[in-house]
Amino acid sequence: MKKTAIALALASAVALTACGNDEPDGTDTGMEDPTVSQWEQPEVRGPLQDTDQEDVDKVAHDVVEQIFSWSPKDDHTIADAARKAEPLMDEDFAYNNRDSWAGMFKVPGKQWASWVNDNATTSVELTEGLEERPEDTDMEARRQYSVEVTIKGDKQEQKLRYDVFAHFNNLGWWRLDNITISQPQTMS
C-alpha cells in the first residue's frame, strides 16, 4: 500500500509538471493595463450650460446668480429662476426645495404680480463675502454672497438686497446642496 501511495504521488507530480508553461520565468505580462477613460462634464441645458462644473467658484457664482435672475416678463412665478438652476444642484436638494423657492425669497405673490403688470426686468449683482469660513476640501465648499436685485419696470424701480450662504458638495462635479437666504432689505 505504501508503494502504491508513493507511486501515485510521484505520478501526480510528473503530471502537474508536464502541464506547466514552457515559457521561462518572468515572461508573463500579467493583466493588460486598464483603458484610461476621462470623465466629461454632465450635459447641462439652459442658462448654466457653459458653467465649468469642476470650478466651485464658477458653479457657486452661476447658481446663485441664476436663482435670483427673476424674469417677470417670461416666468410664471418667482421660483422659475431657481428651477432653471436645478441642473447644478444636488438632486435631493433640488427635489426637496422645488416648492419652497417663492417662500425663500420672501416676495409676496402680490408684489410679483405688480412687477409682471409693470413689464419689469431684473438685473443681479453678486458680491462675494470674504468673511472667515471653513476651508474648502476636495468634497465640500462654502460661499457667501451679498446679492442685489434691481427690478425695473415701466413705472417703478426697486432694489432688494439679500445675504446668501451656500454649501456645495463634490461628487465628481460641484453641486449646490444647501442654501440660506436672508430677509430682503429694500435699498433706496
What are these model-predicted stretches?
Residues K2-P72:
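Juxtamembrane and targeting peptides
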